Amino acid sequence: MKSMDDRTVGLISASSSRASLKIQPEIGYPRICDYCQPIIELMTASEFARHIRQDHTTKEGGSFLCRYGEHGVCQKLPLEGVCDLDFEAHIRRCHTSSQPAGYSSPTSSLVASYTEDSEETASLRSIRLTSDRDTPTIEKKKFTLHSFTQNLSAVLADPSRSRSDLTTFFTRHWGDSFVPTQPVPQSKRLARLADSAFDSYCQSAGESYRRYQAIKRALRLSHADGGVGIGDERQDAEDLPTIFIDPRFTLGDSSTFSDVFTVPANDDLDALKQTLSGRNVIPATPLEIATNRKPGEFRDYEALQNRLEMMHDVVDGRLAGKLVAKTDDFWQVVRSYSGLQEQLANALQCVMVVRKNLKRVDELVCDQSKKIVEVHERYEQKKKLLAKLHDISCLREAQSTVQMMLSQGDYPKAIECIETSLDVLSKELNGVTCFRHLASQLRELYTVIGRMMNEDFASLIQKELGVKPEAGTMIQAEGELSAVLLGLMRMRKYSFIAVLREEIIEGVKSVMRQVIKNQILNNGVDLNDFDPSLTQLGEPVRRMKHADFLKTVKAVMDEEFYFCKRLEALQDILLETVERANPLHRHGSEDIIVERIEEAKDIHESESDDEVGTTFSKSASSGGFSVGGSALSSNASATTLLSIEVRSEAFLRHVLPLIAEFGHQCAQQRISRLLIARAKNASVTEATTPTQLSECIKLVKEFQSKCDKEGWYSTQNQKVGGLGRSVNKLSMDYIEKFHAARKIRIGNMLDTELWKATDVSIVDQNIVDMAMETGQLRNTKRIDDGPIKKSFKRTESAVTIDSTTSTSNQIQGVIVDEENYVVVGSSITMIQLLSDYCEAISEMPSFSQDWNSRVVELLKTFNSRCCQLILGAGALQLVGLKTISVRNLALAGRSLELVCRFIPMVHDEMDRVLPENRKSLLRYFKQVESEYRDHVNEIAAKLISVIAHYTTNCLGMWDVKGVIPSPEFQQICRHMLKFHNGLVGIMPRDQIEALFRQVHENFKANLREHVTGMGITPHDPLKYGYVTKDYMFYQQNVKNMESCRNLELESLNDIMFE
């Protein structure tokens, strides 16, 4: 903490000092300390030096050690430390200066340190360390392994230690030898390696080393050979006086003369001693040294002569050595010069021969070839001229040739003739005066031919599509049609696609109209009230019988399929013609195609919505109609693509393969209108059965399957197609009307139900019997007789608790697995409706999800309505019942039980047709069945509560007296007998027994409560005996009831002490 405070004070003082001196920013500052954490930013060199003094310096003895470095060791200061003055120089030289330490010497750094600004020097010296106590040592920082390091030199030079301690510093602890006496054992973790492990390495390394030694030896020899020359050359150039080797040396120059022959003023400036190397090959002679002459006087002649002669001898000897060294090279050059002269002479002779031969070749070959080329050029020019004359002659007959081809019906050749003539006029014969009007005439004729071909194509298509061809042929005028199409392709007039589109639509309409007319006439429909021309066919179609209508639909589908096959043949002709017209151009601009498709999307979508409607979205959720056909290969259908104007060959190639598919889609629309026209009559829809509708759907599926095999669903699958959507719409409308009619019927039946037992016909019993035998609920007749009813006896008793009459007549009802169900008429009607739904589900399995929701809704409606009418007493207001009797409750319960018996059959029927991913919808049947059983239990509880209410009231008025049996117990027994008689004949005996067992349990509880309340116990024998007599009277009456004979009744003691 103290060091941090000192550091803060130092930084503050340095900052204030810097601010007072207004020091400009220094180079390399501000900088950070490389070894302090957290990071400290230092603004000036003096501030950085002060930081090193405080945090990175230790003092040992009288020496200062720098710790600013890795592991607290400075690599640029002696380990023994330095004095204070040298330490300042070290900081400036190695740490605070922006110049690298290698460019300054200690002396220069010291001088620079003394020449610095006095105030900065004072500030640096002000932070010198005065004692070890104030020195911030490195031990105060994070403890590391290097914390144990000491400066050995500073320790040995410590003046506080005695001389004996210093002399024995090493030997006192380590001994005299400084060698460990015990060898270090071999590590067990290192594997032992034999010498053979290094054999391969020694071989490869040995070869490399020998190669290296050879190269090194050769390099050393080459350096030894050239070293002398290099040294001599440097010696020759550098140890001679520079004045003599100067290229501008001349004694005529006064300065040069004075430098050579006069004594210089300073001996160091003697020109004869100044050399490049600093050495002088000829030093001054003793005579010259002994001669003492003044500056400016002439040198001693003899001494100068001797010195110059010696220089001359040295130079002469060196030149001689050079010449001797270059002698071999010189004579080699001389010898090679004579051989070079001989080679040049031979080459000159060869060149002369070649030039002579080339001249002969030029005369014999080149001149002849030049003449041949000139003749060929004249020939080509004349040939071109002849071709132009031929073109002129042909152009003169161009119009007549075109007329002749048109008369023969050969449109492609006529167009080719016009195009060729126009091309020749624009290129080869451009500017010919006699043909100045021919181009405009040919263009006009070209336009006329285009109109003619369009008219011919329209007439040919009308003829082909309007008349049914002979057996075995698809296209009658194939040749004429191919010629016209080829001509239109050559002229790039693609408007014939629009004509073809309209003719296909009209052809589809005419085919269906003709088939329907024939079917109406053949079926003998009454036409008195209708137009004889049969322009409006909707009403006659609605008057047809179902079988006749199916035949009509089948005939229309067959004819339309054959019509689409003819369109496919026409499509093949068109594709072949396109390939003949332009066989090389097979790829168009896809960007243009996509753009044109997007332009017509909205138009086609609006048209299809107006024609078919939007009901498909409803049926799509249930997966109504089967999905098949090819996958969508484009974002637009064939109808959309054919509605776009064709402007390029690329787009034409794209839409031509869709002509048959376009015809198929048009046929789907017409068939859809036929089906919708019949469905507009409500009476026809109501009379249609699910079987009849399934037959119609089957015809549609067969037609779609045939078309799918032909590949006519490439741009639109079966479900999205117009026919698929129409069938889904018709089916959903039928399902909705079917359900609404039956829901209204069962609602009306329940609203008018008198809640009395009804007679059951043989037909209804047959429905139940067949369902129990086959496990499938169907509304079919086993016998062909009329509706014969069983003669059941009705009971006119409306038994209530207040009634005075009783009856025990048994009535017969529906027998299900040998169990008789006496029910109301609405439950029988509900069974019939469920059989209708089961039949519809089996006939229309693709709409199973829609049937599932509606049959569940019908079951819930029946259950909830019964609950409202009986338990909610709604029947009192609707049908005028005076009260809801026990018999009404029993009939309602048995009716619900009967319907509940057939819910699993409907569940199984739905399970057979629902797809696997929709099996979860079956949980609604279990939920409905549970609701029915809960309702039946509520009715049973209501019955028990009614009798329990009367018994409780009677026991409340009961008083133990001498009358045996008491009037209250007689009243209880009468109520129970009426209750029993109301249930007999409706509910089975076991159910009645179960009800009375519960009634008896309630009676026991009430009796025990009242007896205990009156304080009667066995210790009061008189009153307890009266109670026992009353209870025995109760037991006897209960046992006399037919359904309760097997009922076990406890004694009074058992009841009281239970």
UniProtKB/Swiss-Prot annotation:
- Per the record, what is one GO cellular component? cytosol
Compartment annotation? Golgi apparatus, trans-Golgi network
Which GO biological process entries does UniProt record here?
Answer: Golgi to vacuole transport; protein transport; retrograde transport, endosome to Golgi
Q: What is its main location?
A: Golgi
Would the keyword Calcium turn up in this protein's UniProt record? no
GO MF annotation terms: syntaxin binding
Q: Does the keyword Transport apply?
A: yes
**Coiled coil feature spans:** 369-389
The domain of life is: Eukaryota
Q: Which residues cross the membrane?
A: none
Gene3D superfamilies (UniProt xref): 1.20.1280.130, 6.10.250.860
How does gene deletion manifest?
Answer: Mutants are viable but display reduced brood size and enlarged lysosomes.
What InterPro entries does the entry give?
Vps54, Vps54_C, VPS54_N
List UniProt keywords, sorted A-Z: Coiled coil, Golgi apparatus, Protein transport, Transport
Assigned protein family: Belongs to the VPS54 family.
Give the protein's function.
Answer: Acts as a component of the GARP complex that is involved in retrograde transport from early and late endosomes to the trans-Golgi network (TGN). The GARP complex facilitates tethering as well as SNARE complex assembly at the Golgi.
Listed under subunit, the entry gives:
Component of the Golgi-associated retrograde protein (GARP) complex, also called VFT (VPS fifty-three) complex, composed of vps-51, vps-52, vps-53 and vps-54. Within the complex interacts with vps-52 and vps-53.
Name recorded for this polypeptide: Vacuolar protein sorting-associated protein 54
From which source organism is this entry?
A: Caenorhabditis elegans
